[in-house]
Amino acid sequence: MPHPLLPDITPVAASTAAAHGFELVEIQILTHLQPMTVQVQIRRTDGSDVSLDDCAGFSGPMGEALESQALLTEAYVLEISSPGIGEQLQSDRDFQTFRSYPVEVLYRDDEGREQRQQGSLLERNADHVQVNVRGRIKRIARASVISVQLISPTG
Protein backbone atom coordinates (compact mmCIF):
# COMPACT_ATOMS: atom_id res chain seq x y z
CA MET A 1 0.00 0.00 0.00
CA PRO A 2 1.50 3.36 -0.98
CA HIS A 3 2.31 5.84 1.74
CA PRO A 4 -0.43 8.49 2.19
CA LEU A 5 2.07 11.33 1.62
CA LEU A 6 3.18 9.97 -1.76
CA PRO A 7 0.63 12.04 -3.75
CA ASP A 8 1.92 15.21 -2.03
CA ILE A 9 5.63 14.41 -2.29
CA THR A 10 5.65 13.13 -5.89
CA PRO A 11 4.96 16.52 -7.56
CA VAL A 12 7.63 18.16 -5.37
CA ALA A 13 10.16 15.52 -6.41
CA ALA A 14 9.14 15.70 -10.09
CA SER A 15 9.45 19.49 -10.29
CA THR A 16 12.76 19.49 -8.41
CA ALA A 17 14.12 16.81 -10.73
CA ALA A 18 12.96 18.72 -13.83
CA ALA A 19 14.59 21.92 -12.57
CA HIS A 20 17.92 20.08 -12.40
CA GLY A 21 17.75 18.30 -15.78
CA PHE A 22 16.38 15.01 -14.49
CA GLU A 23 13.16 13.08 -14.78
CA LEU A 24 11.55 11.44 -11.75
CA VAL A 25 11.36 7.67 -12.33
CA GLU A 26 9.96 6.53 -9.01
CA ILE A 27 9.61 7.58 -5.40
CA GLN A 28 9.02 5.30 -2.44
CA ILE A 29 8.57 5.95 1.25
CA LEU A 30 9.75 3.03 3.37
CA THR A 31 8.29 3.38 6.85
CA HIS A 32 9.43 -0.06 8.05
CA LEU A 33 13.00 1.27 8.31
CA GLN A 34 14.20 3.39 11.23
CA PRO A 35 14.46 6.20 10.46
CA MET A 36 12.04 6.01 7.56
CA THR A 37 13.63 6.19 4.11
CA VAL A 38 12.55 8.26 1.12
CA GLN A 39 13.93 6.65 -2.05
CA VAL A 40 13.98 8.82 -5.18
CA GLN A 41 15.00 7.40 -8.56
CA ILE A 42 15.97 9.83 -11.31
CA ARG A 43 17.25 9.66 -14.86
CA ARG A 44 18.63 12.33 -17.17
CA THR A 45 16.14 13.88 -19.56
CA ASP A 46 18.66 13.55 -22.40
CA GLY A 47 18.94 9.80 -21.84
CA SER A 48 22.59 9.81 -20.77
CA ASP A 49 23.75 7.90 -17.71
CA VAL A 50 23.26 9.25 -14.20
CA SER A 51 26.53 9.26 -12.26
CA LEU A 52 27.14 8.94 -8.55
CA ASP A 53 28.10 12.64 -8.57
CA ASP A 54 24.73 13.45 -10.17
CA CYS A 55 22.92 11.61 -7.38
CA ALA A 56 25.01 13.30 -4.70
CA GLY A 57 24.50 16.70 -6.33
CA PHE A 58 20.74 16.22 -6.55
CA SER A 59 20.43 15.09 -2.93
CA GLY A 60 20.85 18.64 -1.56
CA PRO A 61 18.18 20.34 -3.70
CA MET A 62 15.80 17.41 -3.20
CA GLY A 63 16.28 17.52 0.58
CA GLU A 64 15.73 21.29 0.61
CA ALA A 65 12.54 20.91 -1.44
CA LEU A 66 11.17 18.29 0.95
CA GLU A 67 12.08 20.38 3.99
CA SER A 68 10.50 23.55 2.53
CA GLN A 69 7.19 21.73 2.07
CA ALA A 70 7.28 20.40 5.66
CA LEU A 71 5.39 17.27 4.62
CA LEU A 72 7.56 14.83 6.57
CA THR A 73 7.23 15.37 10.30
CA GLU A 74 9.64 12.67 11.48
CA ALA A 75 13.29 11.92 10.82
CA TYR A 76 14.05 10.34 7.46
CA VAL A 77 16.92 9.25 5.25
CA LEU A 78 16.91 10.50 1.66
CA GLU A 79 18.32 8.10 -0.95
CA ILE A 80 18.88 9.23 -4.53
CA SER A 81 19.58 6.62 -7.22
CA SER A 82 19.01 5.83 -10.86
CA PRO A 83 17.30 2.79 -12.37
CA GLY A 84 19.67 0.00 -13.25
CA ILE A 85 19.71 -3.63 -14.28
CA GLY A 86 17.04 -5.63 -12.48
CA GLU A 87 14.59 -2.76 -12.53
CA GLN A 88 10.98 -3.01 -13.62
CA LEU A 89 10.03 -1.37 -16.89
CA GLN A 90 7.09 0.95 -16.38
CA SER A 91 6.89 3.86 -18.81
CA ASP A 92 6.60 3.80 -22.59
CA ARG A 93 10.08 5.32 -22.65
CA ASP A 94 11.43 2.35 -20.63
CA PHE A 95 9.98 -0.09 -23.15
CA GLN A 96 11.48 1.85 -26.07
CA THR A 97 14.87 2.27 -24.41
CA PHE A 98 15.22 -1.41 -23.51
CA ARG A 99 13.87 -2.90 -26.75
CA SER A 100 15.83 -6.10 -27.55
CA TYR A 101 17.16 -6.36 -23.98
CA PRO A 102 16.60 -9.58 -22.00
CA VAL A 103 13.50 -9.37 -19.80
CA GLU A 104 11.33 -11.53 -17.62
CA VAL A 105 7.58 -11.02 -17.94
CA LEU A 106 5.46 -12.01 -14.96
CA TYR A 107 1.84 -12.51 -16.00
CA ARG A 108 -1.36 -14.43 -15.23
CA ASP A 109 -2.37 -17.18 -17.63
CA ASP A 110 -5.96 -17.96 -18.66
CA GLU A 111 -6.49 -19.96 -15.46
CA GLY A 112 -5.23 -17.09 -13.28
CA ARG A 113 -1.89 -18.74 -12.40
CA GLU A 114 1.25 -16.64 -12.31
CA GLN A 115 3.66 -17.49 -15.12
CA ARG A 116 7.13 -16.22 -16.02
CA GLN A 117 8.46 -15.83 -19.54
CA GLN A 118 12.02 -14.81 -20.36
CA GLY A 119 13.16 -13.49 -23.71
CA SER A 120 14.25 -10.40 -25.63
CA LEU A 121 11.82 -7.49 -25.43
CA LEU A 122 10.34 -6.66 -28.84
CA GLU A 123 7.66 -4.14 -27.97
CA ARG A 124 4.76 -3.14 -25.80
CA ASN A 125 1.66 -1.75 -27.47
CA ALA A 126 -1.88 -1.06 -26.28
CA ASP A 127 -2.79 -4.76 -26.40
CA HIS A 128 0.32 -6.91 -25.92
CA VAL A 129 3.85 -7.23 -24.66
CA GLN A 130 5.88 -9.08 -27.28
CA VAL A 131 8.97 -11.09 -26.37
CA ASN A 132 11.31 -13.06 -28.64
CA VAL A 133 11.80 -16.49 -27.06
CA ARG A 134 14.50 -18.42 -28.94
CA GLY A 135 13.38 -17.04 -32.30
CA ARG A 136 9.63 -17.29 -31.67
CA ILE A 137 7.45 -14.33 -30.86
CA LYS A 138 5.44 -14.71 -27.65
CA ARG A 139 2.54 -12.25 -27.33
CA ILE A 140 1.25 -11.71 -23.82
CA ALA A 141 -1.96 -9.74 -23.32
CA ARG A 142 -1.05 -6.47 -21.63
CA ALA A 143 -4.01 -6.81 -19.26
CA SER A 144 -2.48 -10.08 -17.98
CA VAL A 145 0.99 -8.64 -17.38
CA ILE A 146 1.93 -8.10 -13.75
CA SER A 147 5.47 -6.83 -14.36
CA VAL A 148 8.29 -6.70 -16.90
CA GLN A 149 11.78 -6.69 -15.43
CA LEU A 150 15.24 -6.40 -16.95
CA ILE A 151 17.41 -9.43 -16.32
CA SER A 152 21.06 -10.21 -16.92
CA PRO A 153 21.80 -11.74 -20.35
CA THR A 154 22.47 -15.13 -18.76
CA GLY A 155 19.06 -15.11 -17.05
Curated annotation (Swiss-Prot):
SUPFAM superfamilies associated with the record: YhbC-like, N-terminal domain
GO cellular component: cytosol
A UniProt-annotated Pfam family: RimP_N
UniProt-listed GO biological process terms: ribosomal small subunit assembly; translation
InterPro entries: Ribosome_maturation_RimP, RimP_N, RimP_N_sf
Keyword GTP-binding: no
Subcellular location per the Swiss-Prot or TrEMBL entry: Cytoplasm
Entry keyword set: Cytoplasm, Ribosome biogenesis
Family designation: Belongs to the RimP family.
HAMAP family listed in its UniProt record: RimP
PANTHER family: RIBOSOME MATURATION FACTOR RIMP
Function: Required for maturation of 30S ribosomal subunits.
Name listed for the protein in its UniProt record: Ribosome maturation factor RimP
Organism: Synechococcus sp. (strain WH7803)
UniProt gene name: rimP
